[in-house]
Design a protein with these regions (language model features):
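Catalytic-core regions of core metabolic enzymes
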Residues: 1-617
């Protein structure tokens, strides 16, 4: 596509371009704007500068005519004969700060707009903001501010540029991309920031009919579980099927066990086949050898199954892509929701439905956790139980062959028992759908992402391809959509539990660590609780005379477990305190073991211990 054609295309979507004029080979050149640049437009000349086919700073029509003649001569001297099919373009030369806007059809997030410093500095500094083509103005602004160069829009050095103009420009790009669905990649570089606003001076666009997105299928409600079948329930205590069957005994609905050997398990009939089940089932858990799963799903369709949890491994994770694809094709054909394969299972607190082979020590609560790693999930469940954190839902997605993160977030948004969502993410199948779900979510979404190194990228013809498919894009897009990215796995259960915390109190035996912790608390938008005169009076009776009478409550370095206990018994009664940190550093007299035992007690307020040291603690 020639520069003239690109300008016409962009102008149709109201994307500003410089004044320009297309000039025929046999046409006398004339322009009513100067200075101009003149370039050849011909498929015969790819690298214009090498052919001497670009002339700059032309200030009159006479000079324009001379420049055209010189370009023709230069090109012909290179052995290329021009004719009436070739054209020229005269473009008004414009000055301004060089910026970059582009679009990539990312394998995960779909069509995504990129913004950064223009010219050759783009790839050098990789200072890039990422913006979804579906983002609203607020999300666009957050995406733009992901690049440091966006400070230009904050009246930098009194230049008077507003970020509103950049947001308007991005919205025009969004409209252009949606109106031209075959656009697969685009570079606008540079886009000049001028007194008149942003102007796209140079553009390259790649088209691909395969870039058109397909619609997602309408699903049944995965969390609507009334009748459950456990395929592979086993009386062998060493098998996964035994653990799942035992965990499922608390379910408030109907649970059926299936095992080809028959018999009984936990006082319930073991049906020899799916066909023997006394009724239809909406949900099936499958824990049998992988070679039997497809035929089992076939049987389950005759029981009108809507949801299938494939616990069994032996698919993509060991290289059997074909076997996994057969599962995908089958469940899509029959509109079955599939979790897995190769997963830990599923839990729903409201109905005491535990279809996992993890611990049965699970408390009902308001946090939903979705994880691609069963091992990480099992560890989080154990840690949560120890800290009395309950779950509304737990979903181990395993290979995530069918239902993905976006669909689960969308479904959890409609679950009243769920108040917050935490995700352990190794990779995403459909980032675009996830962003849509995140925008609509009325519940906070916390994410820990592993595999942060650059992932595989499709070959690209532009700057854009070198800046996509990485953790920075993942982070930029998700944070702009309102998600909270974490740098600690255990924060997936602790951060949501502390979401409503406002006032924090610190009990410590050392000033330095408490000072560091104070900064940490304040930087995260929490308040350090201010002790009242009455609070101080009560603490005075329990602490040495020289305690600082402020929060952090420094109980002095010689504090032992008895002083920690008296202090905690007092501060847990302070009505406005939401959370208590307890800092312990090793002094000669510090009885660390007794203090640790003390901190494990059931206190009225959440207590988070911080043991600073090594061997002695």
């Amino acid at each position: 596509m020639t520069e003239s054609e690109l300008y016409n295309l962009l102008s149709a979507s109201k994307i500003p371009v410089p004044p320009y004029k297309s000039i025929g080979f046999n046409e006398k050149p004339a322009a009513d704007f100067f200075p101009v640049a003149l370039k050849i437009e011909s498929p015969k000349v790819i690298h214009k500068s090498e052919f001497g086919a670009v002339k700059l700073n032309i200030t009159s029509n006479e000079a324009l005519e001379a420049a055209k003649a010189e370009i023709i001569k230069n090109v012909e001297n290179k052995g290329v004969k021009l004719d009436g099919s070739d054209r020229f373009i005269a473009t008004k030369m414009t000055r301004g700060e060089e910026l970059y806007f582009g679009m990539v059809n990312d394998a995960v997030f779909g069509k995504t707009i990129l913004f950064g410093k223009g010219g050759v500095l783009l790839e050098l500094y990789k200072d890039v903001g990422y913006i979804s083509i579906d983002a609203d103005r607020a999300e666009i602004e957050r995406g733009l501010k992901g690049a440091k160069i966006s400070k230009l829009f904050d009246n930098f050095r009194g230049l008077g540029f507003s970020i509103d103009g950049a947001i308007d420009f991005v919205q025009k790009l969004q409209n252009f991309i949606k109106q031209n669905p075959s656009v697969s990649e685009m570079d606008l570089n540079p886009v000049l920031l001028t007194d008149e606003g942003l102007i796209a001076v140079d553009a390259r666009i790649q088209f691909d009919d395969h870039a058109i997105e397909t619609a997602r299928r309408k699903r049944h409600d995965f969390f609507d579980n009334k009748k459950v079948a456990i395929i592979g329930a086993s009386s062998d205590q060493n098998k996964v099927g035994y653990a799942i069957a035992k965990n499922a005994l608390t379910f408030k609905g109907e649970a059926y066990f299936v095992n080809a050997k028959g018999g009984e398990l936990f006082g319930k009939t073991l049906y020899k086949s799916v066909a023997e089940l006394p009724s239809d089932v909406d949900t099936a858990v499958i824990s049998i050898p992988s070679k039997f799963i497809l035929s089992t799903l076939e049987e389950l369709t005759r029981k009108n199954v809507k949801n299938a949890l494939v616990i069994s491994a032996g698919f993509k994770e060991i290289g059997d892509l074909e076997g996994e694809q057969k599962l995908i094709d089958f469940v899509q054909k029959h509109n079955i929701n599939m979790i897995g394969p190769n997963c830990l299972g599923y839990y729903k607190g409201e109905t005491d439905l535990n279809l996992t082979f993890g611990s049965n020590n699970v408390l009902s609560g308001d946090l939903a956790v979705v994880s691609q790693s069963g091992a990480v999930l099992a560890a989080l469940m154990d840690k949560a139980f120890q800290n009395k954190i309950g779950f509304s839902h737990i979903v181990s997605v395993g290979n995530m062959a069918d239902i993905d993160f976006g669909e689960l977030v969308e479904a959890l948004n409609d679950e009243p028992a769920c108040k917050a969502i935490s995700l352990y993410v190794e990779g995403m199948n459909d980032g675009k759908a996830f962003l849509q779900a995140a925008r609509k979510s009325k519940k906070p979404i916390y994410i820990f992402k592993t595999g942060r190194s650059a992932e595989s990228k499709a070959a690209a013809f532009s700057h854009t391809g070198n800046l996509s498919g990485n953790y920075e894009m993942f982070k930029g897009l998700l944070e702009s959509a309102g998600c909270i990215l974490l740098d600690n796995i255990e924060a997936l259960i602790f951060r949501p539990a502390l979401n409503d915390v406002k006032n924090v109190l610190i009990v410590t035996n050392a000033g330095g660590p408490a000072s560091i912790l104070t900064d940490y608390i304040v930087e995260r938008g929490k308040n350090l609780y201010k002790l009242t005169d009455e609070n101080i009076k009560i603490l005075d009776a329990a602490l040495p005379f020289n305690w600082p009478k402020a929060n952090p409550v420094d109980i002095i370095g010689d504090a032992m477990s008895d002083r920690y206990q008296k202090t905690l018994e007092i501060v847990q009664e302070f009505d406005e305190v939401d959370l208590i940190y307890v800092v312990v550093t090793p002094q000669f007299m510090t009885d660390g073991d007794k203090i640790a035992e003390l901190l494990l007690k059931n206190w009225k307020k959440p207590v988070i211990p911080i043991m600073v040291g090594g061997y002695d603690l």
